[in-house]
Amino acid sequence: LLSRGLGDVYKRQGQTLRHDHAFPKGANANLYDVLSQDHLVIRTFERGVEDFTYACGTGTGSLVALLTALGQTSGHGVRVENLGGQLIVDAEQTDGQISALLLTGPATLVCQGHVPDEALPEESTK
């Protein structure tokens, strides 16, 4: 679906899910399409960014874990297309449960920052 020009529809869905009353503080929304058993497309609408981001390892790993547990992917070498590129995900299972995830793909440093302790709320530094 994402590859068929439905980006605006997905963005509206992402906004709706991100602000759903079930999540009082908001939530990230992961929208996906299955291209084949082990080839997925995912878009993550992130809280705070209020738009799609290039990639989300947590969302990507969660998607593969869920689809593997449901038997919809093999869990081995699953290709997941993010806006920022492709990740390969392996979901290890132990006794029928996902026990580990391995995400492999490129990583690029896009910014760097420093927050001094004085800028943090007092309870954060204890």
What are these regions (language model features)?
Residues 1-10:
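Single conserved hydrophobic/aromatic residue that forms the stacking wall/gate
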Residues 7, 59-61, 107:
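Gly/Ser/Thr-rich beta-alpha loop segments that engage phosphate groups in nucleotides
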Residues 45-68:
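Glycine/serine-rich anion-binding loops at beta->alpha junctions
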